[in-house]
Amino acid sequence: MGLLRLLVLCTLAACCMARSPPAPPLPQRPLSPLHPLGCNDSEVLAVAGFALQNINRDQKDGYMLSLNRVHDVREHYQEDMGSLFYLTLDVLETDCHVLSRKAQKDCKPRMFYESVYGQCKAMFHINKPRRVLYLPAYNCTLRPVSKRKTHTTCPDCPSPIDLSNPSALEAATESLAKFNSKSPSKKYELVKVTKAMNQWVSGPAYYVEYLIKEAPCTKSQASCSLQHSDSEPVGICQGSTVQSSLRHVPLIQPVEKSVTVTCEFFESQAQVPGDENPAVTQGPQKLPQKNTAPTSSPSVTAPRGSIQHLPELDDEKPEESKGGSPEEAFPVQLDLTTNPQGDTLDVSFLYLEPGDKKLVVLPFPGKEQRSAECPGPEKENNPLVLPP
């Protein structure tokens, strides 16, 4: 029996000493030159602020955007050229029209029931020694907040309506007429309605925002020749009409309607007093396509980016969202190149010294390998206004 035990132990020892051939090493992913940064880092927040300021300046219509949180950020450091940042920003629409050119700090996000929210992707170039701040490209996608979900939270809150609603146009016309009646000399005309909401108070109520322009005739002119109709808007008004419900009053008494209006006039577009960071505007407003997409024809001129407005998610047809991931609710694409090795972007016009100055631009990164500190903390933590 002892001999048998010894034989078993020797067999086990031999098995333990036997080695299997080593597995082949796994192929290593090449190191990316894009360095992930924390989304709440003070420098990152400053870069995000510069980028969003430039996005707002590039708009000719709509409302200014504010930063809700940094969703993702990568930095590509390029020696004497400085850094190119790849930013994904969650944004909220503010109460400031882009034509007002107000400072970002003076603009406030809208109430939750009228919120417009979304996501922007942007590339932003910084060269601190040369004092260069430049936005080569951006794209944004925005949606209004879900009316169904806001009504669940606040059933009596105002609800956004279509800008072409006849009652909204009537509210704009009547409130502007009231403003003109109090204007000492100039008259103003409606350009277009930019926001519209309705609510039941003591009766139907309509709240509108609209752009105005100077009318070709003043109040003192009985007749005058018409000016060109494409004059620029000079201000924005907020008007409302509230019609009282008087069912308990005899029919001989007319229905009461309350009309309110306030208007704000835009400052000169030539210079914005007190505007921060003038270096952000270095470079032309519109660039040849060769500076924004190296493989395109140099004769084509295109803007640096765009803002896409989509309907609220509840308004989409089932087949439009069927099978889609949550990220597809805010499709934002920003690829100046699809070359994994990158392409060059000529930014010589930003620099005073002679010689070519080129940035290496890589495909915009996805979620892989982003910082564990992203997304960052949000300013408005309402889940109704946070993209996935």
UniProtKB/Swiss-Prot annotation:
Residues 270-343, 367-388 are annotated as: Disordered. Transmembrane segments: none annotated. Keywords: Disulfide bond, Fertilization, Glycoprotein, Metalloenzyme inhibitor, Metalloprotease inhibitor, Phosphoprotein, Protease inhibitor, Repeat, Secreted, Signal. Disulfide bonds join 96-107, 120-140, 154-157, 217-224, 237-263. GO terms for biological process: binding of sperm to zona pellucida; negative regulation of endopeptidase activity; single fertilization. Pfam families: Cystatin (PF00031). Residues 28-141, 152-264 form the Cystatin fetuin-B-type domain. The modification Phosphoserine is found at residue 321. Residues 1-18 form the signal peptide. One of its GO terms (molecular function) is metalloendopeptidase inhibitor activity. The keyword Transmembrane does not apply. One of its GO terms (cellular component) is extracellular region. Residues 279-300 have a biased composition (Polar residues). Residues 367-381 have a biased composition (Basic and acidic residues). Belongs to the fetuin family. Protease inhibitor required for egg fertilization. Required to prevent premature zona pellucida hardening before fertilization, probably by inhibiting the protease activity of ASTL, a protease that mediates the cleavage of ZP2 and triggers zona pellucida hardening. This is Fetuin-B. It comes from Mus musculus (Mouse).
